[in-house]
Each structure stands twice: as C-alpha cells, then as structure tokens.
A protein has these predicted regions:
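N-terminal amphipathic/hydrophobic targeting modules at extreme N-termini
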Residues: 1-7, 12, 18, 22-24
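Intrinsically disordered, glycine-rich low-complexity segments
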Residues: 16-17, 31
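Nucleotide/phosphate-binding sheet-loop regions of phosphoryl- and nucleotidyl-transfer enzymes
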Residues: 29-423, 450, 456-459, 466-471, ...
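Extended, non-globular alpha-helical segments
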Residues: 431-468
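Structural motif
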Residues: 461-463, 481-482, 504
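A short, small-residue-rich loop immediately preceding and capping a beta-strand
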Residues: 476-483, 501
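Acidic, glycine-rich catalytic loops of TOPRIM or P-loop NTPase phosphate-binding modules used
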Residues: 498-504
Length: 504
C-alpha cells in the first residue's frame, strides 16, 4: 500500500472570504497564474537553440551576444507574432504593438539614444529571419527613424552632412520599395541621372548637395506613386516596416524558394529590430560578407568581400564590385585580425562553415549575422571531411552536413578541353559558382521562363540579379552578371542551386 501523501490527507474546509477585499485578492491571485504569451525578446534574452521562435537570424544574434561578440543591441519579434498577424487578417494585435514599443524603450536605454530624437537619434534596421536560411527572399529596411529634422541632427552630430543625406535617401528608397511597393527602378534611374549630371560613375562620388537633391526627388517619387507624403513619425515607420517584413513571407519569390527547398509555409518569419551601425560614414568604414571557408571549393581559407564607405545591401546586391577580404588586412589590420579571431570562434562553436555579415564603423568591427553557409556539393564534401580530420565533428555528424539533394550536382558539367582550345574567349569574370553551361542568352527572368517553356536552354545575363529573379535563375543553365562578386546575391543563390555562375 502506498503511503498517504500530505495532499491525500483530509484537510479542514477553509471558509471562503466573501468580502470585497477578499474578492480582489482572489482575482489578483488568479491573474498572476495566467502567463501571457511573450512576442518580443532582447538579444540578451535568447540563445541559439530558439530558432523556431526567434528565426535563424534572431537566434544567432542572441547566441553571438551571449558569447560576448560585438553585436549591436536589438530585439526580435517572434515567428508566433507573424503567425498571429496572418490569423488576425494581416494586422498586428494591439498587445503585440504595445510590446514592440516597450522593447523600443528598452533598446533606447541600452543604446543611450532615442528614436526620433533630434539631438541624439536612434536609427534601426528591420530585417526578416526565418528559421531556415532564405538568402535574399524576404525584405530588409535600413536606417529607419529618419525624417527631415532627424537628418539635420545627424548631420550636425557627425559633422558629415553627406553621410546623413546618403543614409536618408537610402531609407526612403528601401521603405518605398518594401513597404509601399514603389518599383526601385524609379529611384535607381534618379541616381543614374544625378551621376550623369555630375559626370561621375560611382554613388560615392556624389556630394552632400547631390544627396539632398536626391532626398527631395525620392520623396516626390513616393508621393507621386502613393498619393501621400512620406511618413515622418518613426513609430509609424517601424510598425509599417514590421508588417511589410511579415508580408514578405508570402511574396512570390519566398513562396517559390520554400517550395524548392521544402520549407513549410506555416513556419512564418521573425523580425529583428537592431540599432544601426554605419559603414557609409567615410573611408574608415565599410561593410562586407565573409565565409570561414571557400563556399565554392571548400578550401580552408578565410574567404569574403567588402566595400569601403558602403552599407550591407551594396555588397549582396552587387551594385559595386567589392574588394577581397584579403585587402582588409592591408587597410585595417587590427579589424582584420579581430574578425579572423571571431570567425574562427564561430566555426568552432557551430561546428560548421559560417557565412557572416559585418560592418565597420569608424574603425570598429560589428557582427550583424552568422549562419551556416550555402556551399556547392564539392565544397560540402570537402568541408565535412576536413572538419572530421580537425576533430571538430564525428563521421556521423559529417554525413549530416551533406544534403542528399546535392549529390546529383556533385559532378558539375565541364567543357571538352579540345572545344575550349578552339573557342574564342569573349569575356572572363569571377568563378562565383563552378561548372559549365551552354544556352541562348536572355536578359531577364521572364524571358528565361518563356524560352525554357518552349524547350530552349538559356543563360541568364543580368547587370546584377535580385531576389525577384529567383525563378529565372533556377531554370537557367548558367548565370552571368556584369556587376557583383563572389558574395553577391547571384553567387550565393547559384551555389545553393548548383548552377554555374560567373560574376564580373
């Protein structure tokens, strides 16, 4: 017979307190037993095991924060908030909005800056982050919090009006594209016309007055398409941006990518809101993407690219051809050494090749992302074997690092050497993704889809690819981009798909 526990013994019946104060005490006790769902987490409150809730980006930012790495302060709005957004008819519930603003206040306290303040303004990025990596498929907005008054404050604070107005025009362009769906081509055309007018080739050659003019042109473009002025209230900018990132989970390119990669539509995306650090303040600033090993070959060598005086989207978009990460060692040796040390720590911590985003502001390094890097089939095999030889993983773990679907692409097509000798070389470029391809040249993704449907083989040729090109890229034999580099959008996506790609 089991011994009688204390809870099993007969207890004397307690008399209920039916007074008003007793009722209040009962209500408060019951209320305290109800645990409300938490939809927002500071980076310092999460960790790398929380991918389902915080998404890959949010979980890894939290993990890097816990490891003491130089990560700008921020918070993550969970995937459950995204699910709730769709359940509520594509609206953000009042309690979730209130929680987001509560965490904005916490972020302001951590940063020592205030959103919308003219004297010491906080600017933030708003970025997507699904639990599975979907490079470039969803949306990002940088420099949020700017308006006509704040930009003047930043110009005064930094003594750098060119930087302030460059940052402002970038924000208007990204907000208009992502939130209001104003085609980005209108803004790019305005920039090209300004460069022609000034007789320069690069955005970086435009001065402060040029940037001011672009800001006014961009605001006029926004109003012309939307029918109302560009929003000036930072909290309105923030909530509209969070909604836009949630919506981007269901944009056509994201849906296509999920189908191709077996990612459930029910997962949703998290949203990271992070204090901005700036790579576009001058020549002691920059931004880049790097891998702990070569993602094309698997070679154990630090691999990546960066741009001086730029923001992160400039690198992945291929707007300018970046410099090799090796050149950073010459330009900023202390930053390079610190970055190399962090990269080594991250690979050992995650026990896999890492794909990292970083920004340098006034000679100081900041980590903005890390994730397991996309790689070719050959690279996957070499990296898995090397990690075993280095004692980082077991043979059983190595098998799991190679995606079975990649094995078909393991033997990339190669040209017949005799044919190569006879062929006339028209152009050479960077080997962004290995292989060989033959086909008819097409200049846009829509034409690629039409021609492939007619049974033709095509080579997709673009100035630079964008996420909107994903379907055309997937069905092409090969990809050629005029601008970009080894870490551009075209390169990263092509390697993941096992498609030959060269990028100038």
């Amino acid at each position: 017979m089991l011994p009688e526990s204390d809870s099993m013994r007969t207890q004397p019946e307690q008399k209920k307190d039916t007074t008003f104060s007793g009722g209040i005490r009962y209500f408060m006790k019951e209320r305290s037993n109800i645990v409300s769902k938490k939809y927002v987490y500071l980076f310092s409150e999460g960790n790398g095991s929380m991918r389902e809730l915080l998404g890959g980006k949010g979980a890894n930012l939290a993990e890097m924060t816990s490891l003491g790495m130089p990560v700008p302060h921020g918070f993550t709005v969970t995937t459950e908030a995204c699910t709730r957004y769709y359940e509520d008819g594509k609206t953000i519930a009042p309690e979730i909005e209130a929680e987001i603003f509560e965490f904005v206040s916490k972020l302001e306290a951590l940063a020592g800056k205030k959103l919308g303040d003219k004297e010491n303004p906080l600017l933030v990025s708003v970025r997507s982050g699904a639990r599975a990596s979907m490079p470039g498929m969803m949306d990002t907005i940088l420099n949020l919090g700017l308006n006509d008054e704040v930009v003047e404050g930043i110009a005064k604070l930094t003594q750098n009006p060119r930087f302030a107005y460059d940052t402002y025009r970038r924000f208007i362009q990204m907000f208009a594209d992502v939130v209001a769906e104003v085609p980005k081509e209108y803004f790019e055309r305005a920039i090209d016309l300004m460069k022609q007018k000034k007789g320069v080739k690069q955005d970086t050659e435009l001065d402060a007055d040029d940037m001011k003019q672009l800001v006014e042109q961009f605001k006029a473009l926004y109003k012309g398409h939307i029918g109302r002025d560009f929003p000036t209230e930072p909290k309105v900018q923030l909530m509209e941006s969070v909604k836009a990132v949630f919506r981007s989970w269901d944009n056509p390119r994201a849906i296509y990518y999920r189908r191709q990669n077996g990612i459930p539509s029910s997962w949703g995306t998290a949203v990271t809101v992070q204090m901005m650090v700036f790579g576009n303040m001058g020549n002691d600033c920059g931004t880049g993407v790097a891998f702990t090993r070569n993602p094309a070959t698997g070679e154990k060598k630090f691999f990546g690219e960066f741009l001086v005086n730029a923001q992160g989207e400039d690198v992945v978009a291929g707007i300018r051809t970046p410099q090799s990460i090796d050149e950073l060692k010459q330009l900023m040796p202390e930053v390079y050494d610190q970055f190399l040390e962090i990269a080594t720590r991250l690979e050992r911590h995650y026990k896999d090749m890492q794909d990292m985003e970083f920004t340098i502001e006034r000679g100081k390094l900041f980590m903005l992302q890390t994730r397991n890097g996309k790689r070719t089939a050959q690279a996957a095999m070499k990296i898995a074997c090397d990690l075993v030889d280095e004692g980082l993983i077991t043979e059983e773990q190595a098998v799991l690092l190679v995606d079975p679907s990649q094995l078909d692409a393991f033997l990339h097509d190669q040209f017949n050497p005799a044919e190569l000798k006879r062929a006339k070389i028209l152009a050479t470029a960077l080997p962004a993704s290995p292989g060989a391809a033959c086909g008819q040249v097409v200049f846009d993704a829509e034409t690629a889809k039409e021609w492939v449907a007619e049974g033709k083989k095509v080579i997709l040729v673009r100035l630079e690819t964008s996420p909107e090109d994903i379907e055309g890229m997937h069905i092409s034999e090969g990809i050629l981009t005029v601008r970009g580099g080894m870490t551009s959008h075209a390169a990263v996506v092509a390697r993941g798909m096992g498609i030959c790609c060269i990028s100038s």
